[in-house]
Regions:
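Conserved GNAT acetyl-CoA-binding A-motif
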Residues: 99-113
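Basic/polar N-terminal segments that are highly enriched at the extreme N-terminus
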Residues: 1-12
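Conserved catalytic-core motifs of GNAT/GCN5-like acyltransferases
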Residues: 108-110, 126-143
């Protein structure tokens, strides 16, 4: 159960807790409203790309967003027994095509060094930033961009 913080005052409570999907949804809504007002673009759209086997089981999936002239990939996963079969590349191609159709000129994605940075490089993505020591000492969070 979340506990009030010692910094509580008469009018407010600071509460530290675990994951909260309701709070996440509210924060997203509030930030979207602020961002849309700031830049004059409100065409943020989420998308997904997935691969299923003949039994309807998930083989691979990708989720992301488009907004204005930019697209971003949030998550990519390929089932272990289906890796090295080209599904990741096909999902990237489908994502890039969708982003172009929505008027995007660039696509952003991040990958930890123990995940798939070389995969993105092979598909034409360029590293533009790197944060060392994340999420562990011997790893890094690598940020990529691809011009569409």
């Amino acid at each position: 159960m979340p506990q009030p913080s010692p910094s509580t005052d008469a009018a407010h409570r600071l509460i530290v807790g675990g994951g909260d999907s309701e709070l996440d949804s509210r924060l997203s809504k509030e930030l979207d409203a602020y961002n849309f007002a700031a830049v004059g673009e409100s065409n943020l759209e989420e998308f997904t790309v997935k691969v299923e086997d003949t039994d309807g089981q998930l083989v691979a999936g990708l989720s992301g967003w488009t907004w204005g002239t930019c697209a971003g990939i949030g998550m990519v996963w390929v089932r272990e027994d289906s890796r090295k079969e080209g599904w990741g590349g096909r999902m990237l191609e489908a994502t890039e095509q969708l982003a172009r159709e929505r008027g995007c000129r660039q696509l952003l994605v991040s990958s930890f060094t123990f995940q798939a940075p070389d995969f993105y490089r092979r598909h034409g993505y360029t590293e533009f930033a790197r944060s060392e020591g994340l999420p562990i000492e011997d790893a890094a969070d690598v940020h990529f961009v691809k011009a569409l």
